[in-house]
Amino acid sequence: MTVLEVALGQYGIKEIVGKKHNPEVLKYFHEMGHDWVKDDETAWCSAFINWCAMWADKPFSDKLNARSWLDVGTEVEIPDIGDVVILWRESPGSWKGHVGLFIREAGNYIYILGGNQNNQVCIKAYPKKQLLEYRKL
């Protein structure tokens, strides 16, 4: 099974608003050894891609920071569907980022399948100008 196939199998999993937390979101942390995470409000884009890569038997960062994926796999200029996409958040120099899987480019946007996108696993468009790298696992 590919990372993309694992991720697609989770499509639609979402956070629970309020005091309850979705055990499906928490498993992305717990099955990777991050048992200290107790709520689904903790940023989980990297946990999700780590979990998918683990189940696909591919390399993973094992870290919760999206930019940790800049050290996993091989950088590619032209991505294939399912390659890892790393974006910056706030500013290119910030430690903050987002990680997901490449679906397609259209105009000035990259469509990414990922976790914690609108608080769920879904495909969402991001501005191409926020791209840091594409990575092949």
Locate each region found by the language model.
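A broad, low-specificity signal marking well-ordered, structured residues that form hydrophobic/aromatic
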Residues: 4, 110, 132
